[in-house]
Amino acid sequence: MKKINFRNTLFAAVLLFQLNAVAASGQTVVKGSVKDNTGKPVSGVVVTDGAHFNTTDAEGNYVLNTDPARYPMVYISTPAAYELPSKEGVADGFYQYLDAGKSENQCDFVLTKRQKPVDEFVYIVLSDPQVRNEKQLDRFRTETVPDLKQTADSLKNFEIVGMGLGDLVWDAMNLYAPYRQAVSNLGMTMFQLMGNHDFNLLYKSMTQTDHPADGYGEQNYYQSFGPANYSFNIGKVHVIAMKDIDYDGNKKYTERFTPEDLDWLRKDLSYVPKGNIVFLNVHAPVANNTVAAGGNARNANALFQLLRPYQVHIFSGHTHFYENQLPAPTIYEHNIGAACGAWWAGHVNRCGAPNGYLVVQVKGDDVKWRYKATGCSPDYQFRLYQPGEFESQKDYVVANIWDWDWTYTVNWYEDGVLKGAMQAFDDEDQDYINMVKGKKTGYRTRHLFRAQPSKDAKSVKVVVKNRFGEIFTEEIKL
């Protein structure tokens, strides 16, 4: 009788059990390569499925183990030495969908080597287009889109990257296709991220779903634009897009980073040298003092701990309320005005900032920005009210300076004579009050300034100097 090797038999039984467990859980192996357009392998490229990470080896190859039911894509973080993949001007080609029915998926990527390194580029940040129906989509197409195209044309000597900060639509999954078409071929590479209105309201978010095969909130977005958490590199900047909405279904959600989101970010940043510039793009803000707990991501401190070693600009939307903050010495948040303003009700946000978007110019380590109001000159940086126009400040000239921060100086002149600094105050913006037909909503902005002219004054001039030394002037006759 042949002697039985119990150790080998036990090992084989355990292995068979593990393989069956892997198959039952939907696990698959993803293999692939990253090569340039000449067929040369690209090493050191970061590859992820949204949870697990690897890098390509010297031959440009990688391997990832994943569960495609839970992580339906594999994607790369494009290195700075290569062009950003796109299709008709919309970011594409950096991700691939997995076949959950296969035990092994092959996902290969092709990148185009830049002819020379990028030192200067333009970054355009667009928040909350939030189109709900054809009427709002038409306003976006006829107001915002031509303005974006005009701005891109004026900056055509630079490479331009665009980022939609979420709420691309307003729960209307059928508008993803026309939205994508609207932002195509604008003279930039246009990326997107998810807002609370970009989930399919019939389902919970992936992390809350026990059976993703039955449907999950991100599904339509994934099919239209790719992953929710991803990154890429351009110039000296590492750009990250993240989801900070935890969706419960049926329009219920919490502004927060899930533990899975933060773990993904920690791993992504592990490939970025400390001290580098990071652009983090999210939907809900992390430090807006006006909306506070009513709109900020709840666990922002955990985020800040990961970001502190870097020079960070956070770009956010969600509030329809413009506010700049410095939540940490190396972290500056731009919670910008919405492209739709106050939900396409008119032409201003709840703080009085006009509908528009932020134009960021990057040169090496230098980052500058200016808000671009839709349909207005790039020099239109504040709104001036005559005495009597601002209901609560009838005797004052009032300036609303939407991109204001603590480095600004705001001076005023009466009949050509310098009178000094205007007085900061907080209140609801009059343009917004007028737009909602006099109904006050309690959203008091901090970027208002006032000055009381003499009774016999003939003119008042306001001079605003921003943190970059740029000067904007407006004069009114009394």
Set out the residue ranges of the language-model regions.
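Aromatic sugar-binding surface patches on proteins
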Residues: M188, E428-A451
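Short acidic, glycine-rich surface-loop motifs adjacent to enzyme active sites
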Residues: L269-T290
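N-terminal active-site segment of His-dependent metallophosphoesterases
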Residues: V29, A81-Y176, D456
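Binuclear metal-dependent phosphoesterase catalytic core
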Residues: I331-W404, Y408-D415, R446-K477
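Short, ordered, surface-exposed loop/turn motifs in non-cytosolic proteins
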Residues: T28-A51, P68
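Short, acidic Ser/Thr/Gly-rich low-complexity loop/linker segments typical of extracellular
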Residues: A51-D67, Q423, D429-Q430
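Extended active-site neighborhood of metal-dependent phosphoesterases/phosphodiesterases
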Residues: A80-K87, G93-Y97, M173-K274, G294-F315, ...
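Hydrophobic beta-strand segments
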Residues: V45-D49, M73-V74, V410-W412
